[in-house]
Each structure stands twice: as C-alpha cells, then as structure tokens.
Amino acid sequence: MRSACLVFMAILALLLPAAAHAQDDGAFTAATEAVKAGQYQQITSILVARHGRVIYEHYFDAGGAAALRNTRSATKTVTGILVGAAVDRGLLRPESRVLGYFPDRRARLLYPDGRKAHITVEDFLTMSSILECDDENPVSRGNEERMYLVEDWVQFTLDLPIRGFPEWVPTPAQSPYGRAWSYCTAGPTTLGPLIQRAVKLPLPDFAQTVLFRPLGITDAKWAFTPLHDAMTGGGLQLTTRDLWKLGQLYLNGGRWDGRQVISAAWVRRSLSPHANARPDIDYGYLWWLQTFEIAGKPVKTWGMYGTGGNKVYVLPDQDAVIVVTTW
C-alpha cells in the first residue's frame, strides 16, 4: 500500500547512519500529525525500534496497544519461521517432498502427474513450485479466491495442474536463482497441515511452544480453514508489539532475551535470495528482500508484507525494525 510505504520511507530517513547520534523526535511528531490529519488515513499504528529498544510507538485507532492486528499475508512469514522451528528439531527438511506428508491424497489427485511427487517444502517457501498458481492473475487455476470457495484447501492445492511456460515466459532455468516465482497463497496454506503432520501437534500449539511463548506473545489469534486447520496463508492476528518481536527475532539472528529461539542457520537461509519476485525485489523463505533508496542511499530491508499495507520492515544495517499496520 502506497501510504504505508511513504510513511516507512519518511521514518527510515531518521535511521540513516548520519542521524545515528542525533535522533530527531520532531520527525516522529510530523509523521504522527500527518496520519492524524488524514494524509495516511488507513494507518492504525506505527512502531519504530532501534538497537532492540522501541523509540517511537503511536496508535491511531481506539484499539491502542492491546488491539490485535490482522497481519494478512505477513502470516506467511510466521509460517516460514515455524517451518524453521520444525527443521531445527529434526522433524522436517526444506527438501522434504510435500506429497510424502499426504499419502492419503495421492490416489485422488484431480491432475495426477509424476512431477508433483518432486514438489518440496522449499518450493512452497519460495513461491516457486511447478503448480499453476498465481494470485496476481485473476484467471489462474490456483488464484486464492478460487481456493476460498471450496472446503478442502490442501486438496485444492495438490489438485492444481502443472504450470506451463510458453516461449515468452521465462522458465525456471532462465530465471534468477533457477526458480520461476509467482505469488501463491495456496502453497503456504498447505504448509500448515504439513507442519502439523511433521510435528504431530496442532499448529497453534506448536507455534505457542516454539515461538510465541519464548517471545512473550500471549494473545495470538489464528484464522481457520473450513476443515479447522490453522490458516497459515493469512489472517493471524497479533499486536503491533508482537509483530515487532518477530522482526527483532530475525534481526537478532534468531535470539530473544538470551535464548536461541530459531537457529541462526535457518535465519540466514530464510533471508538469502532464492527467487526474484519483482525487478527490484528478491524473495527468501516467505520474506521479501527489498532495497529502498532513501536520501540517495541504498537501504536494505527484510520484509513481512501483508495486504493493505500491514508490514514489518527489518533494517539490518541500521539495527532497526519498523512496523506499520492498517485497517
């Protein structure tokens, strides 16, 4: 969303090295007044943390700090973190084959194809499976709006046909990092039930044990599919401060309050580029890897992006995290 991006860029200018020793609180005041005046009317909260400490926090709705914010597709990044927690415990691998966790569905695939047996967890983490699934294409078989019309979202995903590559569309071999990217909510949505089968726990319980409790997140609220699986493609509700904690966790290399919550190896792997999402944006394991130009200087970010401008930006070079939430 344009408004969230503009606020981010305005605040980011404060965090450049030149301003490291002289924080300009007046700029935060200006941002607050701009939102209140209706210039960015959909924004509900902004939080800025630097060096692990919150230096600016403001809420523009009645809910305030305690309100749960619908993270939209930023939920996907949480799903990637939970995959990492399972990998850290030896219960899952990025190379694990998706259909291996759903043997009960092999015999009833709508479009059976031997190549589906080779689709991996990593393919879903990087939005680059061979399934024909593109939320940005309204006629795509795998568009998420079609998924929401049926009861079984995992079967919907596994039933999708194989994606075609006409001569004007780059193949994986012709694409950066050897992967052809397309935004597909169905993939991360399927990772939820897959994680449950791998760890043998309901996903909300696993998330509470390995991620939320260690970070002091006490009030996470999941959305659920028609078959009562936690929805890992979107809809998780967290407070603004909880979103900051998730960004700070990765900025800290997986550590929180002196404890290694997620392995540093998984954090590095998640934040490495695995596919190219846009001409100027790479994609990790459900993280957006984007460099902005602020005041003529490149500023690298790792992003949790949700529809409507709900975003968490991690700025590794500035040791900072910015959270923007919207209606």
Predicted regions and their residues:
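Bacterial N-terminal signal peptides
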Residues: 6-17
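A short, well-structured edge-of-sheet supersecondary motif
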Residues: 34-63, 319-323
